[in-house]
Each structure stands twice: as C-alpha cells, then as structure tokens.
Amino acid sequence: MYNLKMEFTKSLIKGKLIKRYKRFFVDVQLNKEVVTAHCPNTGSMKGLLDQGNEVYLLKNDDPKRKLKYGLEIIKAQKNLVGVNTNMANKIVNHGLSNNLIKELKNNELIKPEVFFFKETRFDFFVEKGNQ
C-alpha cells in the first residue's frame, strides 16, 4: 500500500455524511447546514457510505453547475478514501511523475491514454530503457 499525498487546488470542506440517494447525490451536514453534493462515483462504495462518516467536499463556484459541492473523500475506519473517479488517473500520473511508486521509478517516458489497437487504450504507457 502506498501513501500518496495529493494536494487540491482549493481547500476541502469537512462534513458528516447523512445519506446518498439516486446514485449522484449525497446529503452532508456542514456545521449547522445540510447541503446536497454531487457524488461522482456511481459504484456501490460498500462500507464507505455509513451515516456519520467524515467526508470532504470541494466547493464549486461555477454558476452553470446545479450543485455547489462535490464529494471528494470519505473517511472510513481511519482511512481516507478518494471517491472521485475523475481523479484516479491524475493521482497515478502524480505518483509516476514524482517517482512515488517504487516499482515504476525513474522512467524515461510516461504517456497517458495510449492506443495500442483500434479499440484498446491503456491509461498509461511507461518506458524505461528497452522495457
């Protein structure tokens, strides 16, 4: 297991999970206010969605967005779990680019989203020497 530190461009807002519904929505207690946030992960997230779990949201100031907040992280059993599926490749790219993944250190080439065949795409192509 790796501990990759990822920095967000905006400050995360801490709250308590109330519930998730309709796959895309979570209600969160922020101080004395209850807000509805966008849930970017439509998977079951079994074991993460317990009422009262600590969650971290990002505020979005885009007036075109229907919801002001987006769910980024859930704390479950002392672990912080990133739940925004849009961040997965950014986190891996950060780890590769900064030599944080020991098995893949000191690469000469890192290319995201490489097509090998017409319908086969890899998230990353990593090259070191002739490998």
Model-predicted segments: where are they?
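OB-fold/S1-family single-stranded nucleic acid-binding modules
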Residues: D62-N79
